[in-house]
């Protein structure tokens, strides 16, 4: 993975792979011209025609960074060869979040099930210690 700096977000090009909650929130955050959006499920892209790009066009382009959504399985997705070839360019939405929130303490909870429950539990524990949450 390439090392990120805030300067990277000025002139570099990005492909966001995955149009779920994570991918769309990343798209909204980046809010720039040099961002393309792709999802294997074409229905996910119907409201984002200006940013959506076809697989055929992706294979002809060069990106500085590829932002891979958590739900994308690199070994089973339609762009697996492209991702393998560009493996060093792959970052996640969390990489971007941490870059822009270095001064804050963050607890990251990931996974398919139980995030809300674990988040609430951690919130209650920290609040009980009279800490600002």
PLM features per residue range, with description:
Residues 36, 51-54, 91:
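General small-molecule cofactor/ligand-binding pocket signal
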Residues 12-13, 28-29, 61-63, 70-133:
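Phosphate-binding loop of NTP-binding sites
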Residues 43-46, 75-77:
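Short, glycine/polar-rich helix-capping loops at beta-to-alpha or helix-loop-helix junctions
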Residues 18, 39, 68, 110-111:
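Short beta-strand/turn micro-motifs composed of small residues
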Residues 50-62:
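Short acidic low-complexity segments
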Residues 1-15, 19-44:
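Hydrophobic, well-ordered beta-alpha structural blocks that scaffold small-molecule cofactor pockets
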Residues 43-44, 57-58, 95-97:
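Short acidic loop-to-helix transition motifs that present clustered carboxylates
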Residues 46-51, 85-88:
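A short helix-to-beta-strand connector/capping loop
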